[in-house]
From Swiss-Prot:
It comes from Vibrio parahaemolyticus serotype O3:K6 (strain RIMD 2210633). GO terms for molecular function: ATP binding; UDP-N-acetylmuramoylalanine-D-glutamate ligase activity. Cell wall formation. Catalyzes the addition of glutamate to the nucleotide precursor UDP-N-acetylmuramoyl-L-alanine (UMA). ATP binds at G115, S116, N117, G118, K119, S120, T121. Pfam families: Mur_ligase_C (PF02875), Mur_ligase_M (PF08245), MurD-like_N (PF21799). The gene is murD. InterPro entries: Mur-like_cat_sf (IPR036565), Mur_ligase_C (IPR004101), Mur_ligase_C_dom_sf (IPR036615), Mur_ligase_cen (IPR013221), MurD (IPR005762). One of its GO terms (cellular component) is cytoplasm. This is UDP-N-acetylmuramoylalanine--D-glutamate ligase. GO terms for biological process: cell division; cell wall organization; peptidoglycan biosynthetic process; regulation of cell shape.
Length: 437
């Protein structure tokens, strides 16, 4: 392949799962190359799995290797602004990521998703529904399996979640459709400001046949003229129609499915489902054959996931909500006929939680505050009660629960005061839900 004609020495920067997938892919598809790895960590994860023919420089940079490289493949966790990478770029040596290598190698249709919130759910559900429609599907990227590993099995369609970091080093990814879900402040330690962050996200449209964008968030629209389809909370294009007590998902005026037929929780997940319909249609998949999969989809673990539904009480694990924006998204358009018992708290990371107050005011709410920074939530609602642990909360409220109520963990905080990570916190909630439901 002509892309590789003048490339002899490749340096992979950053090991871990992604770095290993790059090394494996290069050795399999371009065995003529000399591949070396640099990782600034003393004990990089995956070092023991590196083939012995591949040299590893650990604990710092190797500027000589970088100077001799014809191509540098960098990990998304390493900023392009890093001085050593800037030196490589100044010399004119191409710096790419694993997604760019995927773009060079893939020969089947690809759809991709980016956004500040919701992209993992959209990616996963797109894959689930495409499989239900009879396709062989490779799902990965920023979620689950690295993109290059997906190429090891043949597929009819690839569905990729792409972060802004991955998009920075991607320039030739051809897509049947690309979705930009929303934009909210994140990763400001990496970007100069919101404009830079948005510009990285917009790169997803560079070689896309169709842009799927959010009518309710103008920041998601491409800056260039290209075919666009929109999703949103009104009745246009992919939208929502309220008819009495029911809400319908619409595809250009046609009712597809009613929200009360879905196991997914929250209005933001209706928007996510609309994006999936748009992506499937753009990829030539008849989603009507997969509506049962949509009905039965409960969401990704720890993301608005129904973990118990007993005696009319739903227990929802949204432990992935480690910031205010995620909790606000989860609470918007919640359909609960009874009282919402909302569990919040943990490590607040210095955040100001007052933006939650107006949303709390609209809910039939019992606010249950726990963990290190639980006190920060106490002034936000008159119902707030302080607990020490999540188990204390559930022991106390379990006897009060009635049919129509919902118990939801959406803490708006990190977990490491009482748990190893948000997954462990969510698992603990799920166990308690099964015990007390």
């Amino acid at each position: 392949m002509e892309r590789w004609q003048n490339i002899h020495n490749v340096v992979v920067v950053g090991l871990g799962i992604t770095g290993l997938s790059v090394v494996k892919h290069l050795r399999k598809t371009q065995p003529q190359l000399t591949v070396k790895v640099i990782d600034t960590r003393d004990n990089p994860p995956g070092a023991e799995r590196l083939p012995e023919q591949v040299e590893l420089h650990r604990g710092g940079w190797n500027t000589q290797w970088l100077a001799e490289a014809d191509l540098v493949v960098t990990n998304p966790g390493i900023a392009l602004a890093t001085p050593e990478i800037q030196t490589v770029l100044a010399k004119g040596t191409p710096v790419v990521g694993d997604i760019e290598l995927f773009a060079w190698a893939v020969n089947k249709p690809v759809v991709a998703i980016t956004g500040s919130n919701g992209k993992s759910t959209v990616t996963d559900l797109t894959g689930v529904m495409a499989k239900a429609a009879g396709l062989t599907v490779g799902v990965g990227g920023n979620i689950g399996v690295p993109a290059l590993e997906l190429l090891e099995q043949d597929a009819d369609l690839y569905v990729l979640e792409l972060s802004s970091f991955q998009l920075e080093t991607t320039s030739s990814l051809k897509l049947k459709a690309a979705a930009f879900l929303n934009l909210s402040e994140d990763h400001m330690d990496r970007y100069e400001g919101m404009a830079d962050y948005r510009a990285a996200k917009l790169r997803i449209f560079d070689h896309a046949e169709l842009a799927v964008v959010n009518r309710d968030d103008q920041e998601t629209y491409p800056e260039v003229e290209m075919p666009v389809v929109t999703f949103g909370s009104d009745e246009q294009a992919y939208g929502l129609e309220v008819d009495g007590s029911r809400t319908w998902l619409l595809d250009h005026g046609q009712r597809v499915i009613a929200s009360d037929e879905l196991k997914l929780v929250g209005k933001h997940n209706l928007a996510n489902a609309l994006v999936v319909l748009a992506l499937l249609k753009a990829a030539g998949v008849d989603y009507h054959n997969a509506l049962n999969a949509l009905k039965n989809y409960t969401g990704l673990t720890h993301r608005c996931q129904v973990v118990a539904d007993n005696r009319g009480v739903k227990w929802v694990n949204d432990s992935k909500a480690t910031n205010i924006a995620s909790t606000m998204a989860a609470l918007s358009g919640l359909e609960s006929t009874g009282k919402l018992y909302l569990l919040v708290g943990g490590v607040g990371k210095g955040a100001d939680f007052t933006p939650l107050k107006p949303i709390f005011a609209t809910l039939n709410l019992q606010l249950c505050c726990f963990g290190l920074d639980g006190d920060d939530f106490m002034p936000l609602h008159e119902s707030a009660i302080r607990f020490n642990t999540m188990e204390d909360v559930i022991q106390q409220i379990s006897s009060q629960l009635k049919s129509g109520d919902m118990v939801m963990l959406s803490p708006a905080c990190a977990s490491f005061d009482q748990f190893d990570n948000f997954m462990a916190r969510g698992d603990a909630f799920a166990v308690l839900a099964q015990k007390y439901a």
